[in-house]
């Protein structure tokens, strides 16, 4: 009986050892899996953080770029408003030039137009105020043209047109014209005018 008990005890001891070994292996494997899972989780967390930082930086740069663009748009809008204001003030001043300034200017603009047309018979057109001034001083007007051009120019006063001032000069048959009205000259030179105003206003 003692022999049988010893055998049973030995079997139990071996079984216990095997159980302990299996449990130890299982525990070790479990720890290993837990460590691997932790490392994977840390790596994933780090990747998520890196991705979030990258996205945040991209978003930050986008916001900054949009803000700069908006500031530039507003700055350009303010500049445009100021330039338009200066041009409108210029138009208003030209439209209300005193006669002693305006008459010599009309002569000069007409001389340039006649030279460009290459004719000595012209029709002049402008707004009612300007045509009235020319009619009132027509002899003087013709004399000033003769002095500047070195020849007599036959000037006919035509119908009024919509303009703030200046002069539109046509050949007598109306086939060719030179538009030296203030409106037209401002329009022709607006690009240069804008550049000059912008430089004066904003440096």
Curated annotation (Swiss-Prot):
It is found in: Cell membrane. It is a peripheral membrane protein. One of its GO terms (cellular component) is proton-transporting two-sector ATPase complex, catalytic domain. Coiled coil: none annotated. Keywords: ATP synthesis, Cell membrane, Hydrogen ion transport, Ion transport, Membrane, Transport. GO terms for biological process: proton motive force-driven plasma membrane ATP synthesis. One of its GO terms (molecular function) is ATP binding. Pfam families: vATP-synt_E. Transmembrane segments: none annotated. Component of the A-type ATP synthase that produces ATP from ADP in the presence of a proton gradient across the membrane. Belongs to the V-ATPase E subunit family. NCBIfam families: PRK03963.1 (NF003049). Has multiple subunits with at least A(3), B(3), C, D, E, F, H, I and proteolipid K(x). HAMAP family: ATP_synth_E_arch. This is A-type ATP synthase subunit E.
């Amino acid at each position: 009986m003692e022999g049988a008990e010893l055998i049973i005890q030995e079997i139990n001891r071996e079984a216990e050892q095997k159980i302990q070994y299996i449990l130890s292996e299982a525990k070790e494997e479990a720890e290993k899996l837990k460590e691997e899972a932790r490392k994977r989780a840390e790596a994933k967390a780090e990747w998520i953080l890196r991705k979030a930082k990258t996205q945040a930086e991209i978003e930050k740069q986008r916001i900054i770029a949009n803000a700069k663009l908006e500031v530039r748009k507003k700055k350009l809008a303010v500049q445009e408003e100021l330039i338009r204001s200066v041009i409108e003030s210029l138009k208003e001043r030209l439209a209300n030039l005193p006669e002693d300034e305006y008459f010599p200017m009309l002569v000069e603009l007409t001389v340039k137009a006649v030279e460009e047309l290459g004719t000595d018979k012209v029709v002049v057109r402008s707004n009612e105020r300007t045509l009235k001034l020319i009619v009132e001083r027509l002899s003087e007007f013709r004399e000033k043209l003769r002095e500047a051009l070195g020849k007599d120019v036959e000037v006919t006063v035509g119908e009024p047109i919509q303009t703030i001032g200046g002069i539109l000069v046509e050949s007598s048959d109306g086939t060719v014209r030179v538009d030296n009205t203030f409106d037209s000259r401002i329009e022709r030179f607006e690009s240069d005018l804008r550049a000059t105003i912008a430089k004066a206003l904003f440096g």
